């Protein structure tokens, strides 16, 4: 049968295995740039961040030319403004897929992730603003027997 234990000292102690919070370190490539990918809807953006004068380039164009609507320009600049780093980084992005709104969101997501790779201290500010979270909303698929994803065909009684 099992041996009886007379006291807790005989049982011994369990080693504490506290999982320490992950330490975020600076991740740079050979040219001193931080790289990240951002996604939104069907758009995928590849973003490089390096210290500079604040120039933002999207697909080899100035971002004001690529995203003509002011709303899209504002979306793109949100993580930079939230982290008070305007005019400190040059950002180069290549984005493909989706429409302009999805592409702007993808570049914003990529900029946020690249900024945290370059400067890990910004992570709390950007996470609180919701810039590091991938927006998982995508278009709902069309179903057969329906006009669109949910809209039914017009019904006629007679």
Swiss-Prot record:
GO CC, alphabetical: cytosolic small ribosomal subunit
GO BP terms, alphabetized: translation
Family annotation (InterPro entries): Ribosomal_Su5_D2-typ_SF, Ribosomal_uS9, Ribosomal_uS9_bac/plastid, Ribosomal_uS9_CS, Ribsml_uS5_D2-typ_fold_subgr
Keyword Repeat: no
Keyword Ribosomal protein: yes
UniProt keywords, alphabetically: Ribonucleoprotein, Ribosomal protein
Domain of life: Bacteria
Signal sequence segment: none
Pfam families, alphabetized: Ribosomal_S9 (PF00380)
Family: Belongs to the universal ribosomal protein uS9 family.
UniProt-listed NCBIfam families: PRK00132.1 (NF001099)
Identification of the protein by name: Small ribosomal subunit protein uS9
UniProt organism field: Brucella abortus (strain 2308)
Record lineage: Bacteria, Pseudomonadati, Pseudomonadota, Alphaproteobacteria, Hyphomicrobiales
